[in-house]
C-alpha cells in the first residue's frame, strides 16, 4: 500500500523550497507520496514560520487539529520543522506531547533517520542543531515542477537586525559552493526549467568556493548562472542594501538574463528608526543604490519590505518613510505592523505606538504603494511584454497565464504547447492584480538560445587533422 506524506508550509520562499526538498527526500528514501489531504497521510509535517505575530500559537492551533487524527491512528507520525521549531525546540513537546519529531531548517535532511527512529522504538526525536552545509550534501537530485524553480544558494544571516529572528532560527550565513549550485541549476535546465530564483535570507552576501579554491562573489555567480544553456531568466530573493555592491549593479548592465525587477527591503525611510532596527544603512544610501541601478537598467522596478509602528516611530519618522516611497516609486511591497519577536532586542524596547495608529499608518502606506503599482501597470498598456508561460490561468481554464520580467501576472488566450515556453504578449487590459493581453510572437520566432549538449557541439565543430584524427574547436 502506498505510504503518504502531507506537508503544510507557512512562510517565505525558502520554506517552500525546504518543503519541496523534504518531499523529494522522503520519496527517495521511503517512497512517500505527497497528498493534499491530511487524513490520508502516514506522516504529517508542519514547516513553520516565526516572522508573523503569534506564530507559536498558530502552530499549536494546527497541532490541535492533527491531534485528533493521531487519536484515530496512533501510528501516525507528526513532525514540526522550520523556524518556530528551531526557536521553541523541546517546548513544543511540553505543550503537544503527541508530536514525534522536531527539526530545524538545517536538519531536514535527517528526516529519514528521524522517521526510522520513531518507527523503531516510538521515542520522540528533537534535532534543531546547525550543521552548516551538510544539509545540501544529503538532499536528492532536484526535480522540476514547471518552467520555474527555486534554488537555495545560502542559509542564515549575520546582520542581526533588532526585530528579526532569522539569525537565531536559521543560524549565521553559510554559502553553498558555486559548483554545487551550478550543477543543480544545470540539472533543472535539462528538465525544462527556464527561470531560476536564487534564494537566501541575505542572498547577495553569498561568497562561495569556486572549483579552483578561490572565493567567488554573488556577481560572479550571477554571470555563471546566466551562462547555463536554457536558463533565460534569473531572479533572486532576498537582498540586503549593505551587501548590494557595485559589481552586482554591473551585472544588471551587461546580463540580460537578470530580470528588470528587484526586491530590496529597506523597512523604513527614517535614519533614526533604521538605526534602532540595526539596519546599518541610511535612507540616502538606499536611494543611491536605486539611482545607480536605474542608470544601469532604466526599466528596472523595485519592491521592498516595510515595518510600521516600530518602537519609537513618530509621525515625522513615518512621513520620511512615505517620502522614500514616493522618491523611489516602489512597484510593490510587503508591509507589516511591528510585532515583537521573542528573543530579539526589539522585544525589549518600549512598544509605544498605539495599535490604532499602527493600523492607520499601514493603511496609508499600502494605499500609496497600490496607487504606484497601478500606475506602473498602466504604463505597460499597449506595450509588448515577454511572458514565461507557467500554465493555465486561475481565472479560466480556457486561458494561459505567465509572468512578465517585472513579476506581473498576465492572462491570455493560447495553446497548450506554449506552456513552459516564452511568448510575446501585447498588453490590452490592466486590472488591480493582473494584466490581460494577446500573443503577438511565439518562442519559435524569437531566436532564443537552443539547448546544446557536449555531443552536439562536437558533432557540429568536428574536424580532422592530416592523420585523420578528429578534433573540435570550441
UniProtKB/Swiss-Prot annotation:
EC class: transferase
Statement: the UniProt record of this protein carries the keyword Nucleotide-binding: no
Domain Radical SAM core per the UniProt entry, residue ranges: 143-375
GO cellular component entries: cytosol
Protein's cellular compartments: Cytoplasm
Needed cofactors: [4Fe-4S] cluster
Binding site for [4Fe-4S] cluster 2: 157, 161, 164
Catalysis performed (reactions): N(6)-dimethylallyladenosine(37) in tRNA + (sulfur carrier)-SH + AH2 + 2 S-adenosyl-L-methionine = 2-methylsulfanyl-N(6)-dimethylallyladenosine(37) in tRNA + (sulfur carrier)-H + 5'-deoxyadenosine + L-methionine + A + S-adenosyl-L-homocysteine + 2 H(+)
Superkingdom of this protein's organism: Bacteria
Cofactor comment: Binds 2 [4Fe-4S] clusters. One cluster is coordinated with 3 cysteines and an exchangeable S-adenosyl-L-methionine.
Annotated ranges, domain TRAM: 378-441
Record SMART domains: Elp3 (SM00729)
EC number: 2.8.4.3
Molecular functions (GO terms): 4 iron, 4 sulfur cluster binding; metal ion binding; N6-isopentenyladenosine methylthiotransferase activity
Annotated NCBIfam families: miaB-methiolase (TIGR01574), MiaB/RimO family radical SAM methylthiotransferase (TIGR00089)
Assembly mode: Monomer.
Biological function: Catalyzes the methylthiolation of N6-(dimethylallyl)adenosine (i(6)A), leading to the formation of 2-methylthio-N6-(dimethylallyl)adenosine (ms(2)i(6)A) at position 37 in tRNAs that read codons beginning with uridine.
Family statement drawn from the similarity comment of this UniProt entry: Belongs to the methylthiotransferase family. MiaB subfamily.
UniProt-recorded name of the protein: tRNA-2-methylthio-N(6)-dimethylallyladenosine synthase
Organism: Shigella boydii serotype 18 (strain CDC 3083-94 / BS512)
Lineage: Bacteria, Pseudomonadati, Pseudomonadota, Gammaproteobacteria, Enterobacterales
Amino acid at each position: 500500500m502506498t505510504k503518504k506524506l502531507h506537508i503544510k508550509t507557512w512562510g517565505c520562499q525558502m520554506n517552500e523550497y525546504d518543503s519541496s526538498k523534504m518531499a523529494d527526500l522522503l520519496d527517495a528514501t521511503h517512497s512517500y507520496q505527497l497528498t493534499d489531504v491530511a487524513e490520508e497521510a502516514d506522516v504529517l509535517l508542519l514547516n513553520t514560520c516565526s516572522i508573523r505575530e503569534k506564530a507559536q500559537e498558530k502552530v499549536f492551533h494546527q497541532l490541535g487539529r492533527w491531534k485528533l487524527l493521531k487519536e484515530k491512528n496512533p501510528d501516525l507520525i507528526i513532525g514540526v520543522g522550520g523556524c518556530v521549531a528551531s526557536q521553541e525546540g523541546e517546548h513544543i513537546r511540553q505543550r503537544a506531547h503527541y508530536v514525534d519529531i522536531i527539526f530545524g531548517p538545517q536538519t531536514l535532511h535527517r528526516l529519514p533517520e528521524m522517521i526510522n527512529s520513531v518507527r523503531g522504538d516510538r521515542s520522540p526525536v528533537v534535532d534543531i542543531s546547525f550543521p552548516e552545509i551538510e544539509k545540501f550534501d544529503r538532499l536528492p537530485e532536484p526535480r522540476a515542477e514547471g518552467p520555474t524553480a527555486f534554488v537555495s544558494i545560502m542559509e542564515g544571516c549575520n546582520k542581526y537586525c533588532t526585530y528579526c529572528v532569522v539569525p537565531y532560527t536559521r543560524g549565521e550565513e553559510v554559502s553553498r559552493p558555486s559548483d554545487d549550485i551550478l550543477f543543480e541549476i544545470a540539472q533543472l535546465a535539462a528538465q525544462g526549467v527556464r527561470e531560476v530564483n536564487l534564494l537566501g535570507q541575505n542572498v547577495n552576501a553569498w561568497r562561495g568556493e569556486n572549483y579552483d579554491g578561490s572565493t567567488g562573489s554573488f556577481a560572479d555567480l550571477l554571470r555563471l548562472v546566466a551562462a547555463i544553456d536554457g536558463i533565460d531568466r534569473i531572479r533572486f530573493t532576498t537582498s540586503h542594501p549593505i551587501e548590494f555592491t557595485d559589481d552586482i549593479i554591473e551585472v544588471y548592465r551587461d546580463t540580460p538574463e537578470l530580470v528588470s525587477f528587484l526586491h530590496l527591503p529597506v523597512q523604513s525611510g527614517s535614519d533614526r528608526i533604521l538605526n534602532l532596527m540595526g539596519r546599518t544603512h541610511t535612507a540616502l544610501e538606499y536611494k543611491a543604490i536605486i539611482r545607480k541601478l536605474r542608470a544601469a537598467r532604466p526599466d528596472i522596478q523595485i519592491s521592498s519590505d516595510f515595518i510600521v509602528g516600530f518602537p519609537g516611530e513618530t509621525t515625522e519618522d513615518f512621513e520620511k518613510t512615505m517620502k522614500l516611497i514616493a522618491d523611489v516609486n516602489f512597484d510593490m511591497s510587503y508591509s507589516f505592523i511591528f510585532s515583537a519577536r521573542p528573543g530579539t532586542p526589539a522585544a525589549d524596547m518600549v512598544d509605544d505606538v498605539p495599535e490604532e495608529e499602527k493600523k492607520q499608518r499601514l493603511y496609508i502606506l499600502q494605499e500609496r504603494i497600490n496607487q504606484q503599482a497601478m500606475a506602473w501597470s498602466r504604463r505597460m498598456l499597449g506595450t509588448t511584454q515577454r511572458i514565461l508561460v507557467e500554465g493555465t490561468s486561475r481565472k479560466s481554464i480556457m486561458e494561459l497565464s505567465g509572468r512578465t520580467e517585472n513579476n506581473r501576472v498576465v492572462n491570455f488566450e493560447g495553446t497548450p504547447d506554449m506552456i513552459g515556453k516564452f511568448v510575446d504578449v501585447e498588453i490590452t487590459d490592466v486590472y488591480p492584480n493582473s494584466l490581460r493581453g494577446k500573443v503577438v510572437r511565439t518562442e519559435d520566432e524569437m531566436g532564443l538560445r537552443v539547448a546544446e549538449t557536449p555531443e552536439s557541439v562536437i558533432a557540429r565543430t568536428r574536424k580532422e587533422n592530416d592523420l585523420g584524427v578528429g578534433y573540435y574547436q570550441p
